[in-house]
């Protein structure tokens, strides 16, 4: 891939993604797959007048070794130096860039029960810090190819060819054009217009149906609002949280989901795949989960904490999106969630509450925003999916027909 094109992508992530401010610290989380591209992002951040850029590297084989050899207690510890670092982030409010490239099967064989328990131990210690940062910072999740990931997506190709093909797919779906900043401005305008229409309907609940057996009704929070594309932090800084993105989303009301939903794509969770699964809800809670592959992993995910079995997001994505029309199964939630309508189990988004900036997190949760240590998207959209909005006045409005927008 030409370095000039990659440079444009790095600039897009820094300028339109997190929108680095002069004097702001930047955190970059990355795997070891693309050090040269990470260097480009660091260079672009400094060109944007970042005060300091810190890169935190991840390597899945090391994570497997840690889980294998450390006790649950050790894995779940948060030492004082880590607490001090978290407090530093709360104090300075850095922007965060996550560059995803990990192998979808990279943690296969890991002791998931041990890993889950360690996360449960860490969560109550880390949560107060993340709560203090909620909606204050800018963040962006983007992707770069990893060799194992590329081979998973394009299994019949040589590694080099697969990497090039995955780069092409990432750049195309991320709108890295001759003028990517302008392309994103136009895309954001379209998503914001659709959200404005959805908000004008005052939808009380969404009813999903599809030929695969999906028949699910999800209740909405009266004070909730649809969002999509770029967002504005509480510091007043506009940023794009996901590159790419095609969704209009909202957080539903905890406790109001009835019926069954069938996943339309595999879910990559903690470095392992869950395939051909369904989840049945009663009174908002996931009470039954079945999967042809990864069923125990799915059940472990749903049992992570009390909120993990409730919904935190409903997102609408047409089958005519660039990612869907590419015909590529990415085995990566960032992309696959933007190829199909999806739901998320776990944490809801407080910023989907109107006037959220004048409310506390606890007040948002009282209104119905779910709280959890997880937020896991799973794809449900398909060519036969129909979605109706049941409005406050009882009127039924078609939102999706045959997998695409009905308006």
Feature roles, as predicted:
Residues 362-407:
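Extended hydrophobic packing segments that form well-structured cores
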Residues 286-357:
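Dual-mode signal for accessory low-complexity, basic/Gly-rich regions
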Residues 256-258, 274-276, 283, 309-313, ...:
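Active-site lining segments that contact anionic ligands and/or coordinate catalytic metals
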Residues 250-306:
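Long, well-ordered mid-to-C-terminal structural blocks that present hydrophobic/aromatic surfaces
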Residues 11, 199-201, 270-272, 307, ...:
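Short solvent-exposed loop/turn micro-motifs enriched in small/polar/acidic residues
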Residues 1-258, 389, 395, 405-407:
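Active-site bordering "gate/hinge" segments
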């Amino acid at each position: 891939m030409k370095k000039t094109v990659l440079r444009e992508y790095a600039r897009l992530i820094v300028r339109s993604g997190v929108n680095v401010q002069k004097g702001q610290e930047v955190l970059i989380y990355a795997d070891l797959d693309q050090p040269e591209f990470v260097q480009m992002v660091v260079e672009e951040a400094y060109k944007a007048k970042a005060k300091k850029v810190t890169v935190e590297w991840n390597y899945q084989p090391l994570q497997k070794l840690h889980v294998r050899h450390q006790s649950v207690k050790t894995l779940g510890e948060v030492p004082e130096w880590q607490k001090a670092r978290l407090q530093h982030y709360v104090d300075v409010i850095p922007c965060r860039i996550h560059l995803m490239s990990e192998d979808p099967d990279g943690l296969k064989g890991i002791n998931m029960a041990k890993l889950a328990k360690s996360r449960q131990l860490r969560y109550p210690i880390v949560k107060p810090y993340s709560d203090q940062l909620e909606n204050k910072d800018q963040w962006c999740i983007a992707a770069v190819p990893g060799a194992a990931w590329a081979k998973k997506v394009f299994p019949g190709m040589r590694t080099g060819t697969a990497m090039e093909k995955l780069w092409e797919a990432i750049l195309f779906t991320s709108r890295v054009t001759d003028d990517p900043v302008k392309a994103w401005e136009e895309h954001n305008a379209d998503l914001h217009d659709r959200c404005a229409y959805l908000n004008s309907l005052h939808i009380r609940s969404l009813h999903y149906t599809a030929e695969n057996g999906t028949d699910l009704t999800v209740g909405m929070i009266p004070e909730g609002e649809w969002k999509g594309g770029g967002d504005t932090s509480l510091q007043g800084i506009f940023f794009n949280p996901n590159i790419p993105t095609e969704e209009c989303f909202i957080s539903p009301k905890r406790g109001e989901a009835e019926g069954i939903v069938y996943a339309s794509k595999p879910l990559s969770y903690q470095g392992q795949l869950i395939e051909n699964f369904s989840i049945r809800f009663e009174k908002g809670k996931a009470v039954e989960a079945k999967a042809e592959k990864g069923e125990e992993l799915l059940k472990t995910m749903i049992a992570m904490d009390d909120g993990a079995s409730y919904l935190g997001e409903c997102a609408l994505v047409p089958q005519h999106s660039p990612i869907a029309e590419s015909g590529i199964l990415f085995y990566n939630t960032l992309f696959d969630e933007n190829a199909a309508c999806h739901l998320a189990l776990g944490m809801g988004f407080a910023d989907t509450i109107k006037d959220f900036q004048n409310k506390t997190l606890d007040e948002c949760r009282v209104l119905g925003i779910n709280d959890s240590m997880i937020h896991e998207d799973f794809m449900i959209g398909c060519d036969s999916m129909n979605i109706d909005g049941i409005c406050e006045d009882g009127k039924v409005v078609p939102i999706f027909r045959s997998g695409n927008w009905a308006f």
